[in-house]
């Protein structure tokens, strides 16, 4: 994933990354909002937790964590 831009807004650093192809929301929508399998959910959650650990160690805050913003290549 490439960083495209960054800027400061109200004394907060904002970072813009490239848009990847599929989001968790897209997967849920394709599955008629019936959820995801346990195996897929585990994979996604493990990756989110790993990413959040990295974010915490870097002393950053993600202010908009939602299915639409969890993206896959």
Regions found by a protein language model. Give the residues of each.
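Short beta-strand micro-motifs within the conserved protein kinase catalytic domain, predominantly
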Residues: 2-13
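Conserved alphaE helix
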Residues: 11-14, 19-73
């Amino acid at each position: 994933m490439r960083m495209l831009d960054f800027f400061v807004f109200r004394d907060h650093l904002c970072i813009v990354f490239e848009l990847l192809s599929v989001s968790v929301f897209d997967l849920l929508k394709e599955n008629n909002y019936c959820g995801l399998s346990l195996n897929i959910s585990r994979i996604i959650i493990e990756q989110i937790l790993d990413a959040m650990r990295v974010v915490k160690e870097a002393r950053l805050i993600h202010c908009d964590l939602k299915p639409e913003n969890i993206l896959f290549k």
